[in-house]
Amino acid sequence: ACLARGETCKDDCECCDCDNQCYCPFDWFGGKWHPVGCSCAHANKYFCDHKKEKCKKA
């Protein structure tokens, strides 16, 4: 199962669709591991290719 937009996430690969990224506006620690304030959000079409490559194993 994947996460819809607005749901809390830890990694881009958890979010549904290739134009959905795990965005952390309040993550001052520079990684996706911080659980506070990270949620699936709309990404651009360039991100789509990056995510397909990164999340192939999923």
Curated annotation (Swiss-Prot):
Location(s) in or outside the cell: Secreted
Any GO CC annotation of this UniProt entry: extracellular region
Tissues in which the protein is found: Expressed by the venom gland.
Keyword tags: Disulfide bond, Ion channel impairing toxin, Knottin, Neurotoxin, Secreted, Toxin
GO MF annotation list: ion channel regulator activity; toxin activity
The keyword Nucleotide-binding is assigned to this record: no
Cysteine-cysteine disulfides: C2-C16, C9-C22, C15-C40, C24-C38, C48-C55
Record's keyword annotation contains ATP-binding: no
Family the UniProt entry places it in: Belongs to the neurotoxin 09 (Tx3-6) family.
Role summary: No toxic effects on mice at dose levels of 5 ug per mouse. May be toxic to insects.
UniProt note: domains: The presence of a 'disulfide through disulfide knot' structurally defines this protein as a knottin.
Protein name according to UniProt: U8-ctenitoxin-Pk1a
Organism whose genome encodes this protein: Phoneutria keyserlingi (Brazilian wandering spider)
